[in-house]
A protein has these predicted regions:
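A glycine- and small-aliphatic-rich helix-loop capping segment at beta-alpha/alpha-beta transitions
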Residues: 97-102, 135-139
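Glycine-rich phosphate/pyrophosphate-binding loop and the adjoining helix
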Residues: 138-180
Length: 180
């Protein structure tokens, strides 16, 4: 099964990165993308050229389109998100906003993208509703989300050591093994 994993955290070796590595290690054909490793521009500083022709986007050559291709061509995608102020981090919103250009004038791409099963793992000690709302745009179905609270496992999220707890690893593994 082709699996695409995107970690949206800006911390290269934090909890989200560790979760992504765990998923990759337990999957047969998986690719892990660390969003913060790429220069992906937010929308703006343009004349909305993409609305007429997506290849005219001034940022067309950055990694965004390759990420969207990877998701669209996968059998399963995992989004791994940190909770910043009760919402997904800015990297996730950049990814979501920039997707408009990718799909502009190509409804078949949007349909293929939305059909890919997606699962999200959110590292959060607080709000869940905002994540469910934000993730609802990614799929036809209701978001399949695992919320991992560092507090539940006796950890402090900022330390990035959540995956050192065997119960946290067990919960992620069980989430992965759920039928689609």
């Amino acid at each position: 099964m082709k699996t695409c994993i995107i970690s949206f955290s800006s911390r290269g070796n934090g909890n989200c990165a560790q979760i992504g590595k765990l998923i990759r290690s337990l999957s047969e054909e998986a690719v892990l993308f660390q969003f913060s490793n790429f220069e992906i521009h937010a929308c703006g500083k343009c004349g909305y050229e993409c609305f007429a022709d997506r290849s005219k986007c001034p940022y067309y050559s950055d990694m965004e389109y390759r990420l969207l291709d990877a998701v669209t061509n996968s059998d399963l995608t995992y989004f791994i998100l940190p909770n910043y102020c009760d919402y997904p981090c800015a990297n996730y919103f950049v990814f979501n906003e920039r997707s408009q250009c990718y799909f502009q004038g190509h409804p078949e791409l949007l349909e293929a993208y939305e059909k890919v099963p997606k699962r999200a793992i959110v590292v959060s000690n607080t709000n869940e509703d905002n994540f469910k709302t934000a993730l609802a745009y990614q799929s036809y179905k209701e978001p399949d989300v695992l919320f991992l609270s560092a507090k539940k496992y006796g950890k402090v999220s900022i330390r990035g050591d959540l995956m050192t707890d065997e119960n946290a690893v067990r919960d992620v593994t069980a989430f992965m093994r759920k039928p689609l």
